[in-house]
Amino acid sequence: PYTTLVRSNLIDLFMQLRMLSLHNERLSEIVFSEPEKELPARRVFDENSGVKLEIKNLSYQYDPFSQPIFSNFNLQVEPGESIALVGPSGVGKTTLLKVMCGLLSPTSGEVIADNLDIYKIGLNNYRLGTACVLQEDRLFSGSISDNISGFEDNADEELIVECARRSNIHDEIMKMPMGYETMIGELGLGISGGQKQRLLIARALYRKPSILFMDEATSHLDLKNESAINQSIASLSITRIIVAHRPSTIASADRIIDLSQYGKQAS
């Protein structure tokens, strides 16, 4: 019994140390990041039109003492093309997507959008032409309309409805107690995981992005909803970068990039 107790305590201690290590990795990601430089705001890309995206010799590591998540990675995405990033867990798919959309700064290399270095035009301006739907994204306490528009003053009601239709959730919204003014969140109506994902997609589309980044953004949807959304977004001719595991999601892309095939270049 004593040996069993000691073994159990050692396992608990190991798990605590492992969790502390993970927290330290995330903290170092913040500490070692340089402050962003903002330039005067301007829309760099045309609304709802595809942008050419080039990744040149891209490398990323959490801090100077850790192994690179990926190194010397190169990729070219044509305007309006959809790319699926695939590979086993831990290969760097989400990290690569976050670097491409400007949420993480690369250790080295370049992200070029329509022949413009995203850091030279200013990340604030780059983000004006992009939208992201990430796994950790959430909705906020407020109306459905507010959540789709990002709580924008003088929101475009017609655009809100259009984005909801493209996200295949308009009909469900109209069946709710107050339609688009239905409150959700802590004090409002509870919604399903699939409804949440579709509202997050609608919120991204409201930004009229030229590039749309999606990380497992349709993982809770049935095939019918997923197919309808993919077809609707494809009709916009915007550039899409998708991280996915589901075969149906991967099959919707124009091209598949398997990061595990890059060996040390994307591991």
Placement of each model-derived feature along the sequence:
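ABC-family ATPase nucleotide-binding domain "signature/switch" substructure
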Residues: T130-A131, E136, I144-N147, C163-S167, ...
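Short, small-residue-biased leader/transition segments that mark boundaries at the very start
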Residues: P1-L5, S141
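Short beta-strand immediately N-terminal to the Walker A/P-loop
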Residues: I83-A84, C132
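Conserved ABC transporter NBD signature motif
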Residues: G109-L116, Y126
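Helix-to-loop junction immediately C-terminal to a conserved catalytic motif
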Residues: C101
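The feature captures the beta-strand-to-loop junction immediately N-terminal to the Walker
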Residues: V86-P88
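Cytosolic ends of transmembrane helices, especially the final helix of ABC transmembrane type-1 domains
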Residues: V6-I30
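Primarily ABC-family ATPase nucleotide-binding module
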Residues: V31-I83, E162, S235-L236
